[in-house]
C-alpha cells in the first residue's frame, strides 16, 4: 500500500471518496509513519513523504471510516528538552475523532528504559495502547441552528453524563450512564422543567484511568486524564458498549441534537 502527498489541512484523518487524507503536526519529528491495523494486528506501515510548515500529510487510497490507525515518529530523543521521538511507541492522532481500546499498563507503554531513564525504551507498545479510528463526519442535523441566547437569559447546568443519567429513575436502565441516556426524553424534560437553557458537561472527551487506580480495580470517575480532546469517551456510549466504537460519535451528536430540540 502506497500513499500520495495529500493535503496538510484539515489536521487528523479526513475520509474522501477514494481514500483518506491524514495530516499530523510535528515540528521535531524527522520521519513519521502511519500504521494501519485490522483485527489481527498491524497490517501496513506507510511513511509520510511530505511535510509542509511542520505538518506531515499523506493520502492513502482505499482507506475509509472505521479504519484503525496509529503513528510512529522518528527523530531526536532529548527528554530534558521535552522531545521524545521513539518509533517503538505507537502514538494516537491528537486530532482523532474516535479512539478505541484501553491502555494496558506495563513497561511497554513507557517511553524510557526503566533501567536507564535517560534512554528510550525499545519495547513496542502497539499491543498495549488504544487506536485512533477514521470517522465519517456526516450527520443529519436537520434544521438545527445555534440558539444565540443572551447570557443574561441563560441558566447553565453543569452535569456529569454518567452521574446524572445513572441517578434518574425514568431513564431506561440500559441507557443510564450514556449519551443516549442524556438524550432520552426523561432527562431532557427534567432539565426543561428546572428552567435550564444550557448544559455544561464535565469531561466527555476520551480519557483513561491512572495506573494506580487500575491496580486497585478502580477507575477515574471524572475523566480529566485525557488522551484525545476530539474523541468522545467510549465508556459513556451505549453503542460502544454494544460493540460499535464509531457509534460513540453518532450517539454524541444525537445527544447534542436532542438537547437542542428540547430548547
Protein language model regions, located:
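Loop/turn elements at helix/coil->beta-strand transitions in domains of secreted/extracellular proteins
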Residues: 154, 194-199, 261-263
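Aromatic- and acidic-residue-enriched carbohydrate-binding clefts of CAZyme catalytic domains
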Residues: 171-181, 211-261
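The feature marks proteins involved in alpha-glucan
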Residues: 1-16, 42-43, 51-55, 62-158, ...
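Short proline/glycine-enriched turn/loop motifs at strand-loop junctions of beta-rich domains
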Residues: 25-32, 63-64
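Conserved, mostly hydrophobic/aromatic
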Residues: 24, 71, 159, 191, ...
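Structural beta-strand segments of beta-rich domains
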Residues: 18-22
Amino acid at each position: 500500500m502506497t500513499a500520495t502527498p495529500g493535503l496538510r489541512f484539515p489536521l487528523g484523518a479526513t475520509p474522501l471518496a477514494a481514500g483518506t487524507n491524514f495530516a499530523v503536526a510535528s515540528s521535531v519529528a524527522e520521519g513519521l509513519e502511519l500504521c494501519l491495523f485490522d483485527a489481527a494486528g498491524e497490517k501496513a506501515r506507510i511513511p509520510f513523504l511530505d511535510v509542509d510548515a511542520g505538518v506531515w500529510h499523506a493520502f492513502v487510497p482505499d482507506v475509509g471510516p472505521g479504519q484503525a490507525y496509529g503513528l510512529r515518529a522518528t527523530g531526536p530523543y532529548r527528554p530534558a528538552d521535552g522531545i521524545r521521538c521513539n518509533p517503538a511507541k505507537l502514538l494516537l492522532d491528537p486530532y482523532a475523532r474516535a479512539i478505541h481500546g484501553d491502555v494496558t499498563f506495563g513497561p511497554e507503554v513507557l517511553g524510557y528504559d526503566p533501567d536507564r531513564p535517560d534512554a528510550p525504551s525499545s519495547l513496542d507498545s502497539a499491543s498495549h495502547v488504544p487506536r485512533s479510528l477514521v470517522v465519517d463526519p456526516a450527520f443529519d442535523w436537520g434544521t438545527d441552528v445555534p440558539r444565540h441566547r443572551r447570557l443574561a437569559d441563560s441558566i447553565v447546568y453543569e452535569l456529569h453524563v454518567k452521574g446524572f443519567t445513572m441517578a434518574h429513575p425514568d431513564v431506561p436502565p440500559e441507557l443510564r450512564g450514556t449519551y443516549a441516556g442524556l438524550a432520552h426524553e426523561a432527562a431532557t424534560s427534567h432539565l426543561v422543567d428546572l428552567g435550564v437553557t444550557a448544559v455544561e458537561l464535565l469531561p466527555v472527551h476520551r480519557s483513561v484511568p491512572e495506573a494506580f487506580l487500575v491496580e486497585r480495580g478502580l477507575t477515574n470517575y471524572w475523566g480529566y486524564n485525557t488522551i484525545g480532546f476530539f474523541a468522545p469517551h467510549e465508556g459513556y456510549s451505549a453503542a460502544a458498549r454494544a460493540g460499535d466504537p464509531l457509534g460513540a460519535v453518532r450517539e454524541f451528536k444525537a445527544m447534542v441534537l436532542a438537547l437542542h430540540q428540547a430548547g
